[in-house]
Swiss-Prot record:
Pfam family, one: Ribosomal_S15
Gene Ontology cellular component annotations, sorted alphabetically: cytosolic small ribosomal subunit
Function: One of the primary rRNA binding proteins, it binds directly to 16S rRNA where it helps nucleate assembly of the platform of the 30S subunit by binding and bridging several RNA helices of the 16S rRNA. Forms an intersubunit bridge (bridge B4) with the 23S rRNA of the 50S subunit in the ribosome.
Entry superkingdom: Bacteria
GO molecular function: rRNA binding; structural constituent of ribosome
Keywords recorded for this protein, A-Z: Ribonucleoprotein, Ribosomal protein, RNA-binding, rRNA-binding
The protein's name: Small ribosomal subunit protein uS15
Species whose genome carries this gene: Lactococcus lactis subsp. cremoris (strain MG1363)
Length: 89
């Protein structure tokens, strides 16, 4: 199931750097993290859903690239984000 409009707006409001910010790395990573966690729950109960597994791996790769970009641009923002999202880095 895709992320609902209300949930996405909630995540954007929490991680946006300013009003109307939807494209900053923090927002993109936060939305991807929610989607990744949701897909992990789905895969736990549907182990043979290979299409979803592939989509999950693509999202993980996209998040990894964004995290690398943010780490290179601003280490402090990177550390704050991974602490607030609970990522293991």
């Amino acid at each position: 199931m895709a992320i609902s409009k209300e949930k996405k707006q909630e995540i954007i409001a929490q991680y946006a750097r300013k009003e109307g910010d939807t494209g900053s790395p923090e927002v993109q990573i936060a939305v991807l993290t929610w989607e990744i966690n949701h897909l992990n729950d789905h895969i736990k109960s549907h182990k043979k859903d290979h299409a979803t597994q592939r989509g999950l791996m693509k999202k993980i790769g996209h998040r990894r690239n964004l995290l690398g970009y943010l780490r290179g641009k601003d280490v402090q923002r990177y550390r704050e984000l991974i602490a607030s999202l609970g990522l293991r880095r």
